[in-house]
């Protein structure tokens, strides 16, 4: 069965972005090279084109994201940010998505993920944001957390929602040169 994997970067204090959705404060020097090597499919299509990156998908063939994660692409004029993946945007507030490569899901993200898990294919990447991650917490099978050596102080939390302690077990960890640590967690 396919897994739902929340692959996310966080500050020391647990934020995935600043209050305005900004994430340019995360140090990316050696992290980008690692991402390209390990999870090239998580690089947006328009960035892949600029870099000349033609690497095949290694783990994920589907991405699920909330409106806050999708909106920066729209603001940049990109309607299909991950054209090399099956794309689902979960939002009750977007009136429509004018791109046939992106499916708008207005409700029941848990039902969506359960259906996707039953299909053949690679794993499902939960791209964010924190509200969607909080809603999908019961379905998350694995966390891949890039912990950046920076304190944000405020912003968008990795998980937003009800108090619901959910145990995960560390499976492995890797330190990158910039002080960023990547830790893989399996649902306990």
Question: How would you label these PLM feature ranges?
Answer:
Residues 1-188:
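Enzymes that bind and transform nitrogen-containing heteroaromatic metabolites
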